[in-house]
């Protein structure tokens, strides 16, 4: 172990297997807080590689609470957060649109990172229980086609690094890998990231983690979501290859809006925004969800282009199917809790 730690201190890269060894030591509580802090900072200064990101993500999945679901059928659209945009809950709202398209969505999420309301906060405001048992999450995925997986609940071993991360007060590899650690074995994924320079690398990581198809994007204004404010940069992973692209909202039939147009509020305000979007209320909030759901449908392979995805997303909202998914989740969850 000391040899591997020293390797990083010497600014040398770890292999995926080596990182898995170090991460397992961390998640099993065998490394001191001092050593964890030194390791994370050395890694940050050196720069995290795709192999290192994949290694630590796999280690987290290995010690996570497992949620059983047929391998290779579900997707997630969780982002890293950390873009300081203070936007409303875009990926959470988009998840109901994806589920309405018949895609099982294992929505991995947490409390607020860069806004006043994280996905967990808004879910609670909507009446969604974020601390359900693994078997209940499986039931909801099978019955409704969407379930919320609260990150601290499914990753209890993160307690060994929580204090260290707070003490360091700076982004580390853990700020990048949250969306990579969904305990459900995903087939496809849409992942927003706040660092544009890591788009390609993160797409490669998703390939190493077994995704068949994935999109990693960084929006205009360096958002970890697709944005209507300008050019969006994204990477498509498929068949072992990564290709880079850009896309502006006008290319998919959407108007441009400044970032200020999608500002969010607290959990109560964001829950109201989410409901207004699923009701089809026109404006920047709805169009932002259509764009992100369009990317999600494209990442899943449900459509051949983002434009087709946006058009399908619009139909799913107009038909009321996306709104019905939210109601179904609340209804069936009550049924589970009543047992």
From Swiss-Prot:
5-phospho-alpha-D-ribose 1-diphosphate binds at residues 79, 82-83, 87, 89-92, 107-115, 119. Keywords: Amino-acid biosynthesis, Aromatic amino acid biosynthesis, Glycosyltransferase, Magnesium, Metal-binding, Transferase, Tryptophan biosynthesis. Binds 2 magnesium ions per monomer. InterPro entries: Anthranilate_Pribosyl_Tfrase, Glycosyl_Trfase_fam3, Glycosyl_Trfase_fam3_N_dom, Glycosyl_Trfase_fam3_N_dom_sf, Nuc_phospho_transferase. Anthranilate 2 binds at residue 165. Pathway: Amino-acid biosynthesis; L-tryptophan biosynthesis; L-tryptophan from chorismate: step 2/5. This is Anthranilate phosphoribosyltransferase. Belongs to the anthranilate phosphoribosyltransferase family. GO terms for cellular component: cytosol. Its EC number is 2.4.2.18. Mg(2+) 1 binds at residues 91, 225. Anthranilate 1 binds at residues 79, 110. It is an enzyme of class 2 (transferase). It catalyses: N-(5-phospho-beta-D-ribosyl)anthranilate + diphosphate = 5-phospho-alpha-D-ribose 1-diphosphate + anthranilate. One of its GO terms (biological process) is L-tryptophan biosynthetic process. Catalyzes the transfer of the phosphoribosyl group of 5-phosphorylribose-1-pyrophosphate (PRPP) to anthranilate to yield N-(5'-phosphoribosyl)-anthranilate (PRA). Its cofactor is Mg(2+). PANTHER family: ANTHRANILATE PHOSPHORIBOSYLTRANSFERASE (PTHR43285:SF2). Homodimer.
